[in-house]
Amino acid sequence: MDKFLEVIWSPEALRQKELIENTRSQDQFDMYFSKIILLIENIKQNPFKGLGKPELLKYEIPPCWSRRINKKDRLVYRIHKRDIHIISILGHYND
């Protein structure tokens, strides 16, 4: 059983998901989102190590982490109790 109970998407991350879905082909969206799902599953196993080169973001309170989706985009998330909060899935954390 996974250590984490729930994945909670921020309104911004949901907006970004919709933007990606509406501006890319279905194949591109499927490939992009399958990478996000893979990263989330890896976060459930170990939130601070693993795929996507996890990096603690400096100066963020509460602490946030990022993982590489691709060369340009990062999955930014934070852990709160047993929940994974997805903050952003498009661009870098400081874009």
Protein language model features and the residues they cover:
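Compact soluble domain cores
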Residues: 30-47, 51
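Short amphipathic alpha-helical interface segments enriched in basic and hydrophobic/aromatic residues
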Residues: 17-18, 44
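Enriched for short, Lys/Arg-rich terminal
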Residues: 1-6, 18-30, 51, 57-58, ...
